[in-house]
């Protein structure tokens, strides 16, 4: 078949006679099988230029003819390794190739010399195409499948045009025109068996973009039969070639194909071919003209996207618990937990906030309250409205913090894990333009030099803001020196405490600052601020808080936090659902007492029966007193106010046989019985009377 093309170059035969002659001519089986995989160039290079082709692509090289003119052939697997003659050499005269001889460029149009130059020269803006082709902005130019197209627009494009064009008369012999090499006609393409139908605009866009004139035949049905036979014979050859894609892994990263081996382990959806010579079979979700438009679908089964040198590992690149749907994490909102995580897909802020609010309002187990207070449920709000003020528990937070968890989740560094973090490096939060206090304005300073006085202490800390130095029994002692080497700094502004914390050095979870005295220079002293978030801790938020199951713990060391008190009591008696540290309503510093609420009566009775508890935690080891917490606004449990005129009951019997509030009349009546005459009533003393702190809802 190739000898006929070369020996009949001087004389032109009619097109129908060429097709009839090709159908009658017997072809060896090897020639037919090599036909689809050996596309012919539209130009005939010189003999010395074709010498490198068999060495680099031996599988695609046909038997070399004996004539001086040889047809250039390229490998179907490596479109990037196309060997075409330099553009400076004038090509010899061409003739229209027969449909049986002009084979399809298979997966890309870069196999022909003219089309390859069009890709290389016209893909980048500002460079004039060498071959005279022109790119239209309004038509997608599917030059190579990696630039946004699929295989269907290229395979069988010319053959589709043959069926739509009426058969013209036999072409007359035309003289060769060596002066017009840019108008070289590409080889005729034949339809791929894998793509029986073509997109309606594929041929229009390709023809308009490149201005190539299809090679028309007088017998399209005959050419279709030849094309179908050749394509069917090439099925086994093409499939065997793609099955050996692992062996040509190095060829994808050849100099003519610098982008082929890039990101082999990534998601093929992210692989966007941006370089010339990218390997065939790498799809791209972006259109070269309009990146927002995805390419049209195709029936072609693409070859493997990227050859991998090693098998993929089964472990995901994200943690498995990131996609849980039990609301146990805040990484992805509920709407996005069913699909893989995509860093380029920014979900809406509204969904994120609603998801965090829903997660924060779920029952808290072993979590701290944020510094402005816990995210309150409806039952929690009801309990605090009725009992929190009577119990003297100070909640230093506006109510809006409980409704919107934005500040708590984004600005609170220790939210959700405050039991393990000190929260000393957290900045002061702001809400609605108003600063929200995070620390008490009263700061403990320990390890002072023995010869330092009040004025020297004030001078050492005045740079952080206005303050007053105080220590226990200062007014009675009339001394200018702290008696036990420690003092309290009372700052006027909470921001001064934050500045002091920022200036300290942290070691083993403790803060230190160097202070000088007349005899000691730069002595490290311990700075111990009180974080307001350490005042309350919820062990089990699913249980209601019952003030009649709450105990009072006296003599609590001031460094002890609510979480530590809850852990100690839960370890001893179990059933702890809440623990709180009593703080001063003005300075919000611990007063040395705490309260623990239990979820069951057994734990409550066990705690009050012990009377004393040994608190041990880190450096703390102290024996404290435990007794029932007495409320002063309870009605008599015996008469319900009928005998006392509706007054509150002043007495509470802490004996396990009673555990009730009594008015004076009922107390005398009940405890006059045998076995109860030794019960002692508990009375709310004036000094221990709780203060009613109204909620700050705004």
Curated annotation (Swiss-Prot):
SUPFAM superfamilies: RNA-binding domain, RBD. SMART domains: RRM. The modification Phosphoserine is found at residues 192, 195, 290. It comes from Homo sapiens (Human). Residues 29-44, 103-114 have a biased composition (Polar residues). Following synaptic activity, forms amyloid-like oligomers. Aggregation requires an intact actin cytoskeleton. Interacts with STAT5B; this inhibits STAT5B-mediated transcriptional activation. Interacts with E3 ubiquitin-protein ligase NEURL1; this leads to monoubiquitination and activation of CPEB3. Interacts with CAPN2; this leads to cleavage of CPEB3. Interacts (via C-terminal RNA-binding region) with TOB1; TOB1 also binds CNOT7/CAF1 and recruits it to CPEB3 to form a ternary complex. Interacts with SUMO-conjugating enzyme UBC9. Residues 1-114, 158-208 are annotated as: Disordered. InterPro entries: CEBP_ZZ, CEBP_ZZ_sf, CPEB, Nucleotide-bd_a/b_plait_sf, RBD_domain_sf, RRM_dom. Residues 441-532, 549-631 form the RRM domain. Changing residue 488 to A: Reduced RNA binding. One of its GO terms (cellular component) is nucleoplasm. Changing residue 463 to A: Does not impair RNA binding. The record marks 444, 488 as: Required for RNA-binding activity. The record marks 441-442 as: Cleavage. Keywords: Activator, Amyloid, Cell projection, Cytoplasm, Methylation, Nucleus, Phosphoprotein, Repeat, Repressor, RNA-binding, Synapse, Translation regulation, Ubl conjugation. Residues 13-28, 186-208 have a biased composition (Low complexity). The keyword Nucleus applies. One of its GO terms (biological process) is negative regulation of cytoplasmic translational elongation. It is found in: Cytoplasm; Nucleus; Synapse; Cell projection, Dendrite. This is Cytoplasmic polyadenylation element-binding protein 3. Activated by NEURL1-mediated monoubiquitination, resulting in the growth of new dendritic spines and increased levels of GRIA1 and GRIA2. NEURL1-mediated monoubiquitination facilitates synaptic plasticity and hippocampal-dependent memory storage. Sequence-specific RNA-binding protein which acts as a translational repressor in the basal unstimulated state but, following neuronal stimulation, acts as a translational activator. In contrast to CPEB1, does not bind to the cytoplasmic polyadenylation element (CPE), a uridine-rich sequence element within the mRNA 3'-UTR, but binds to a U-rich loop within a stem-loop structure. Required for the consolidation and maintenance of hippocampal-based long term memory. In the basal state, binds to the mRNA 3'-UTR of the glutamate receptors GRIA2/GLUR2 mRNA and negatively regulates their translation. Residues 87-96, 165-185 have a biased composition (Pro residues). Pfam families: CEBP_ZZ, RRM_7. Belongs to the RRM CPEB family. The modification Asymmetric dimethylarginine is found at residue 308.
């Amino acid at each position: 078949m190739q000898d006929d093309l070369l020996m009949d170059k001087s004389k032109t035969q009619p097109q129908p006679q060429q097709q009839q002659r090709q159908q009658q001519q017997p072809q060896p089986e090897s020639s037919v099988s090599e036909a689809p995989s050996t596309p012919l160039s539209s130009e005939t290079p010189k003999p010395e230029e074709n010498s490198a082709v068999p060495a680099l692509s031996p599988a695609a090289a046909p038997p070399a003819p004996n004539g001086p003119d040889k047809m250039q052939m390229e490998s179907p697997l490596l479109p990037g390794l196309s060997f075409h003659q330099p553009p400076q050499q004038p090509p010899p005269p061409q003739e229209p190739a027969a449909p049986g001889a002009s084979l399809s460029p298979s997966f890309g149009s870069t196999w022909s010399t003219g089309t390859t130059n069009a890709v290389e020269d016209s893909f980048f803006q500002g460079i004039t195409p060498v071959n005279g082709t022109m790119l239209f902005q309004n038509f997608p130019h599917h030059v190579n499948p990696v630039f946004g197209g699929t295989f269907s627009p290229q395979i069988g494009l010319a053959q589709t045009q043959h069926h739509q064009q009426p058969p013209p008369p036999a072409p007359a012999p035309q003289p060769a025109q060596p002066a017009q090499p840019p108008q070289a006609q590409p080889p005729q393409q034949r339809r791929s068996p894998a793509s029986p139908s073509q997109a309606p605009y594929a041929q229009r866009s390709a023809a308009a973009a490149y201005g190539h004139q299809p090679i028309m035949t007088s017998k399209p049905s005959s050419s279709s039969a030849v094309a179908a036979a050749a394509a069917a014979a090439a099925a086994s050859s093409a499939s065997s070639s793609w099955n050996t894609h692992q062996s040509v892994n190095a060829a994808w990263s050849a100099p003519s194909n610098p982008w082929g081996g890039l990101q082999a382990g990534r998601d093929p959806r992210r692989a966007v071919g941006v370089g010339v010579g990218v390997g065939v079979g790498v799809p791209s979700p972006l259109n070269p003209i309009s990146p927002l438009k995805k390419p049209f679908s195709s029936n072609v089964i693409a070859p493997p996207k990227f050859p991998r040198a090693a098998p993929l590992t089964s472990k995901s690149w994200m943690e498995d618990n990131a996609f849980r749907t039990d609301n146990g994490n805040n990484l992805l909102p509920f709407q996005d937990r069913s699909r893989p995580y995509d860093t380029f897909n920014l979900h809406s802020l509204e969904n994120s906030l609603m998801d965090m609010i829903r997660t924060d309002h779920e029952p808290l187990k072993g979590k701290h309250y944020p510094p402005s207070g816990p995210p309150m449920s409806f039952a929690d709000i009801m309990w605090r409205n009725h009992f929190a003020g009577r119990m003297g528990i100070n909640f230093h937070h506006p109510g809006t913090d409980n409704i919107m968890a934005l500040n708590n989740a984004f600005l609170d560094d220790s939210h959700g894990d405050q039991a393990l973090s000190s929260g000393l490096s957290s900045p002061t939060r702001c809400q609605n333009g108003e600063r929200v206090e995070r620390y008490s304005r009263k700061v403990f300073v320990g390890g002072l030099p023995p010869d330092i006085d009040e004025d020297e202490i004030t001078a050492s800390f005045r740079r952080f803001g206005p303050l007053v130095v105080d220590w226990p029994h200062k007014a009675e002692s009339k001394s200018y020196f702290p008696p036990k080497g420690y003092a309290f700094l009372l700052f006027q502004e909470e921001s001064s405490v934050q500045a002091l914390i920022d200036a300290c050095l942290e070691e083993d979870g403790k803060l230190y600052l160097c202070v000088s005295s007349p005899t000691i220079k730069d002595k490290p002293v311990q700075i111990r601020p009180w974080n307001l978030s350490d005042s309350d801790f919820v062990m089990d938020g699913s249980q209601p808080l019952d003030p009649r199951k709450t105990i009072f713990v006296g003599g609590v060391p001031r460094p002890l936090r609510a979480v530590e008190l809850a852990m100690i009591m839960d370890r001893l008696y179990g059933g702890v659902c809440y623990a709180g540290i009593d703080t001063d309503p003005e300075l919000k510093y611990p007063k040395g007492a705490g309260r623990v609420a239990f979820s069951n009566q057994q734990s409550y009775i066990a705690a009050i029966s012990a009377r004393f508890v040994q608190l041990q935690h880190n450096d703390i080891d102290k024996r404290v007193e435990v007794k029932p917490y007495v409320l002063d606004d309870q009605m008599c449990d015996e008469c319900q106010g009928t005998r006392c005129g509706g007054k509150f009951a002043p007495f509470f019997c802490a004996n396990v046989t009673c555990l009730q509030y009594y008015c004076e009349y009922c107390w005398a009546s009940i405890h006059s019985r045998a076995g109860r005459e030794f019960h002692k009533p508990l009375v709310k003393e004036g000094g221990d009377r709780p203060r009613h702190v109204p909620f700050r809802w705004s």
